[in-house]
Amino acid sequence: MNQLECLKKYTDIVVDSGDLVSINKFKLGDVTTNPSLIRQVMSLQKYQYIIYDSIRYAKKKGGSHKFKLENAIDKVSVILGSEILKNISGKISTEIDSRLSFNTNLCIERAKKLISMYEEHDIHRDRVLIKLAATWESVSAAKELKKENIQSNLTLLFSFAQAKICAEAGVFLISPFVGRIYDWYKSKSLIKSAMIDDDPGVNAVRKIYQYYKEYGYHTIIMGASFRNVDQVLALSGCDRLTISPNLLHKLQLSDDLVIRKLIPPKHKKLQPVCMSKSEFCWFHNEDAMAVEKLSEGIRQFGKDQQELENIINNNF
């Protein structure tokens, strides 16, 4: 049995890709996408029909050019997501414009719009996770969306403070970014050794996992942004792991032993009092890595969104 099959005994595996060919190859339940992946996919000739269909939809809806462009962008995500859902049994994670990350009301509005678009494709909201950057405002939006049976995937999660407010809000799922945490510490020459137990990204997820299970939080932990197979295997037993096609392929090629690394504690503790916004801001602000990587991630996804807008605008 290869490592991927062994890993699936302990952890739900998710494909981190927007490419239908890669997704179909691995036959897994769930898929995650983001603006970077969608921009890459939309640059391929075989997916140009999605852009043209989205523009036709936007023109039919009418309004100003800005409104049409916004509708076309969202429709691209929804058409691609709908195509992916035809080939999987689980959920698709679709991200809203990261430039809305500091406005709770706009996050809610855009999330509802995406869900409405999916429902136009006869996709039930239970099969869609709305991806939001894990800011205070976005977590607040996720808490409100939950009341309307719209579940969220809080992404760009780097700090323990972010993990705490997500758990306290009862969000459906979080995506701590293992590789990007590792990158920051490596760039600062702050990693003690090459041993996986000294990997700060791996240890961040281990800490969150232990805390969530110890205090009985139901939010799903999905490790993301892996740089190598060792990081993946070090988190075997995590609720979910979203993995790129390249690393999934490497796992398939190996028959080495896979040992479960994350095991929930037997005894539960009473949950602490929820943090206030000011407490969260200070707690998060104390983590220089998290502050830098969250800001960088939001900017990068915003840049990818802008580039996708340019592609669509040139086809109007």
Curated annotation (Swiss-Prot):
HAMAP family in the record, alphabetically? Transaldolase_1
Q: Give the metabolic or biological pathway.
A: Carbohydrate degradation; pentose phosphate pathway; D-glyceraldehyde 3-phosphate and beta-D-fructose 6-phosphate from D-ribose 5-phosphate and D-xylulose 5-phosphate (non-oxidative stage): step 2/3
**What molecular function does GO assign, one term?**
transaldolase activity
Might you name a Gene Ontology BP term for this protein? pentose-phosphate shunt
Species: Buchnera aphidicola subsp. Baizongia pistaciae (strain Bp)
GO cellular component terms listed in the entry, alphabetical order: cytosol
Lineage, broadest ranks: Bacteria, Pseudomonadati, Pseudomonadota, Gammaproteobacteria, Enterobacterales
This protein's assembly is summarised as: Homodimer.
Stated role: Transaldolase is important for the balance of metabolites in the pentose-phosphate pathway.
Q: Which positions are catalytic residues?
A: 131
Localization (cell): Cytoplasm
The UniProt entry's sequence similarity note says: Belongs to the transaldolase family. Type 1 subfamily.
EC number(s) from the headed UniProt entry:
2.2.1.2
Name recorded for this polypeptide: Transaldolase
Q: Which InterPro entries has this protein been placed in?
A: Aldolase_TIM, TAL/FSA, Transaldolase_1, Transaldolase_AS
Provide the alphabetized UniProt keywords. Answer: Cytoplasm, Pentose shunt, Schiff base, Transferase
Give one Pfam family: TAL_FSA
Reaction equations catalysed = D-sedoheptulose 7-phosphate + D-glyceraldehyde 3-phosphate = D-erythrose 4-phosphate + beta-D-fructose 6-phosphate
